[in-house]
Amino acid sequence: MDLFQALAEPRRRAILSLVWDREREAGEIHRASGDVTFGAVSQHLRVLREAGAVRMRADGRRRLYRADRVAVRRLLARLERMWSDRLERLKTLSEREEEENRR
């Protein structure tokens, strides 16, 4: 699963927000995630890790997670370019149509 697909899931976006500013243990992420099971949180963390959105660091028995801001920012930059190009084309088409309607 790529980063875009991984972030399509609302709980994963919530988890990413939790680990954006600081490293957190899996248990802390679970407690902050509301009514979701620890197993589900672990699955979401695995998907986010495999997609490159978060990094995991082992500290003894603890597993610490932190957002990979560089990877997420690269995705955002790609999306901005994509939407910018499409919006520019839409603007051009709209202006042409408006011009044709004036004639």
Descriptions of predicted regions:
Residues 1-6, 10-37, 62-73:
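N-terminal helix-turn-helix DNA-binding core of bacterial DNA-binding proteins
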Residues 54-56, 71-74:
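Alpha-helical interaction segments
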Residues 45-46:
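Short, hydrophobic-biased segments on the C-terminal half of alpha helices
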Residues 17, 21, 73-103:
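Amphipathic alpha-helical dimerization/coiled-coil segments
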Residues 6-8, 58, 81:
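Coiled-coil-like amphipathic alpha-helices with heptad-repeat character
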Residues 49-60, 64-66:
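Beta-hairpin "wing" of winged helix-turn-helix
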